Amino acid sequence: MKNLKMASIHDIDWSLWRPVDRATLTFIVKDGEILLIRKKRGLGAGKINGPGGRLESDETTLECAIREVQEELIITPLDLTECGCLYFQFTDDYSIHVTVFRAADFEGQPTETDEAIPLWFKVDEIPYEEMWADDILWLPKMLAGESIGGRFLFSDDRMLDYELE
């Protein structure tokens, strides 16, 4: 894709697009609150997000979602529901396909790890200003029970363009 001059989502031929990585994000919503994390390292370090990460070669997206929540928060999400997929292209040629899950319950006690700090927020007080710029576009839809989907173009952590499905 080597096109550092991408400025619009329409500069990308999505029919040929193949992500560098595949990943998951999981949002646990219980009793009017959402469990988020402050990411300590990796892509999005310092930002607030849902727990998640890259798929390993031998696992499904569901297995990845469970593993990542277990690794980042020392809990096990229960009854995960797939909510949709998000496609991210960065101007430095990195790209990632993210499958988003939602869970209404979990086993264990959310615990800080070397990867993440657990944070609970009321669903109407989500700190979007501390999150990736795209989250405010699709997370409310997911919380309302809608399927989500979208394509996003970023330069570092700045969103240049997007298209929701």
Predicted features along the sequence, with ranges:
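Acidic/histidine-enriched, glycine/proline-rich intrinsically disordered or flexible terminal extensions
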Residues: 148-165
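A positional/architectural concept
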Residues: 45-47
